[in-house]
Design a protein with these regions (language model features):
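Bacterial Sec-dependent N-terminal signal peptides
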Residues: 1-23
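GH16 jelly-roll
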Residues: 20-266
Length: 266
């Protein structure tokens, strides 16, 4: 009798779990919960390296496999920028990319993070195309899930760049939401990317939509796989617009998790 009851209970539990998943209509496709100590998993991330300014006159040297700049500890990824007089421009940091290891066309992308603070910091959670099918930036598109510049504390930006809409022309499409405790608490930053539009969220609050006009790739190049990027820049055209405070370093961006779903969980 006990065995029958347990079997029945198991069936009911399985049915309830299946119903919940079906009701939510969302499937987890990929994630990093950062439960591997040390250097971030090379099965999910690669490092981009260099100090050439990255098209924005940034100051940092991005390093690879250096615990000072990127490490996983106690379930959290830390991306940390340091003042370093041995570097030509005076700073080191890290830039992690999932290129070649994880890319998706459409889905719900959510990152739970705590941001650095101070003049000169420029953290970003963003996406670029796996292949530049329509040409180099900005022709093939860019999705900025989260950007924050330290001289404007608490104002978090979600932005889309294309050939027709980009900051070089002053036509980029985006919006901002104030997050007063951005540096002291974790928040979720997300984009729900569908065939017809993108919707941007912070802590589940919707604050920006970008719609597919149906014209051509110059306005919507987002019909191809994109990969994820996590980085902390120093200075640059935007991040360093008000200068760089030399007294604040090191500064860090902490990431609790990165999750990719086929659709937004309800």
């Amino acid at each position: 009798m006990k065995a029958v009851s347990l079997t029945l209970l198991g069936l009911l539990f399985s049915f309830a779990s299946f119903s919940q998943v079906s009701k939510q209509g969302s499937k987890l496709l990929w994630s990093d919960e950062f439960d591997q100590e040390g250097i971030p998993s090379d099965k999910k991330w690669s490092f981009e390296v260099g100090d050439h300014g990255w098209g924005n006159n940034e100051l940092q040297m991005y390093t690879a496999n250096k615990l000072t700049n990127a490490r996983v500890q106690a379930g959290v990824l830390t991306v940390e920028a340091h003042a370093d007089s041995s570097q030509p421009k005076g700073y080191t940091s890290a830039k992690l990319v999932s290129k070649g290891k994880g890319s998706w066309q459409y889905g719900y992308f959510e990152i739970r993070a705590k941001l650095p603070q101070g003049r000169g910091t420029w953290p970003a959670l963003w996406m670029l195309p796996e292949v530049n099918n329509f040409g180099t930036w900005p022709k093939s598109g860019e999705i900025d899930i989260m950007e924050h510049v330290g001289y404007d504390p608490g104002k978090v930006h979600g932005t889309v760049h294309t050939e027709a809409f980009n900051h070089q022309l002053g036509t980029q499409k985006g919006a901002q939401l104030m997050v007063p405790n951005f540096a002291s608490e974790f928040h979720t930053y997300a984009v729900d990317w569908k065939q017809g539009q993108m919707d941007f969220y912070i802590d589940g609050k919707h604050y920006f939509s970008f719609k597919n006009t149906g014209n051509d790739y110059k306005e919507w190049p987002f019909d191809q796989p994109f990969y994820l990027i996590l980085n902390l820049a120093v200075g640059g055209n935007w991040g360093g617009k008000e200068g760089v405070d030399p007294s604040i370093w090191p500064q860090r961006m902490e990431v609790d998790y990165v999750r990719v779903y086929n659709s937004r969980p309800q």
